[in-house]
Amino acid sequence: MGNIVDYVRTDFRTFAEHPFSAVDSLVLSELSYIRLPLVVPVFGAARSIDTIALTGLLRAEDFPMMFAADSQQVNSTRLDLLVAVAESPRFRGLRVGEYIQRDDVDREQQFAAMTFDLGDCTGIRGLFGPGGLLYVAFRGTDGTLLGWKEDFNMAFRCPVPSQESAAKYLSSILDRSAGVPGGDAPAVMVGGHSKGGNMAVYASVRMAARDLDAMQWLADESGESQLPMIEATSMAGRRTSDKQLRIGSADPGDAGNISRGVQDNQNLPTDSTTQHVQPAQRNRYAARICRVFSHDGPGFPKRLESAAFDAVASRVDKTVPQSSVVGMLMDDGLPHRVIEADAVGIMQHLGMSWQVQDGEFVAAPGLSATAMFAGSTVNAWMLGIDPADRRKVIDELYVIFSTPGYRSFGELAEHWTTALPVIIDATRKTDRETRRLVAGVLAALPATAWRNLPQVPQLVIDSLR
């Protein structure tokens, strides 16, 4: 047994010998955490999908920028993964591009995505046809307070800005990779870790909703009352009815362009659900999405009871570790597989701890008692108060942890001797419910972001309860 780095280093089978699996998906999802350099084509700059060979990322002068978002240990492991993938005969031919990154404090958004082209990897075209395979990867939450805030915003709002951006991104990739009429378009897989998994599911459901809208238009024009089935390229979807998806639209301000961040890319469509697309073109979107991967990704505030969700659900492969907390938040009813991990507690959320044997995840007997307790407790809190109160508490938490002036939990941990008193002082000015939640966060942080602390003094935590 080993982790995904060990897997890539030692498993030299081609995709013809061992088809694409959830382990391969986690490999690409982990690579999406890397902050790609300027050499990588930006999103939407070309009419077709623009990529470079993954080996083009192996430039030492770029590494300080590429691996600067998380702890030194995590960054080092991701560099090991990148080098292993670049050297691996299984992934030889892998390309990456269509990179976009946006960190927007005003909109409380942390979003990044990239597209991997596996068409030149040995065995892929034999499995997926001459068009090959694209894997759209959405980055999960990094260690920033901004990313943490958007995650918690999901408790009272759907969609959050990153979910909307994910739908627009996926729509554009599907549009621009369709090729000429009669040509062979690549199959598409979508996935991500943590929040990235949630965005993968949401974006895919939005594409299915577009298909249903288009087919309803065709049915109305032809006088048919029964909508046809939406099927995946290589995995059949469920039969759908004429029930339509109605996901809340984004705030009016969400219609603005999306930037790459430091590279100022502004090419996401302003509204992918209303741009003019002929029905004959629109009804291909969900059919080209053959699988959707959510690696310990949270669900939605309420289950998306819709034909579009049902059309996608059979293609979703959700995996969670034994001590999953994040992946069990806002449980949406999607089946999940429980995976062995060699970390302790909430640290199992890190995909690098998941155990792999013979190219597949090692199955665990079920969720741990701690995970079930934590999940039920947090979900009970979310369901126990109305969305307005949830928003108030979450906003207060964000203000409190932002008060010391640091961008990430890592920086807070590094400067804890000055940051902690500021946090405690700000917390004491809030109501009892907020103080209790802050105490809970502080109690959990030694196992996560506050690694530099031997422990948060229990007296400090008790004083906030």
Please place each PLM-identified region on the residue numbering:
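N-terminal, charged amphipathic alpha-helical interaction modules
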Residues: 42-46, 50-54
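Short Pro/Gly-enriched beta-strand edge/turn motifs at strand-loop
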Residues: 89-101
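Gly/Ala-rich beta-loop-alpha elbow adjacent to hydrolase catalytic centers
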Residues: 192-196, 200, 275
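Short glycine-enriched nucleophile-adjacent loop
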Residues: 201-205
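Alpha/beta hydrolase fold serine-hydrolase catalytic domain that processes acyl esters and thioesters
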Residues: 2-20, 33-36, 54-84, 90, ...
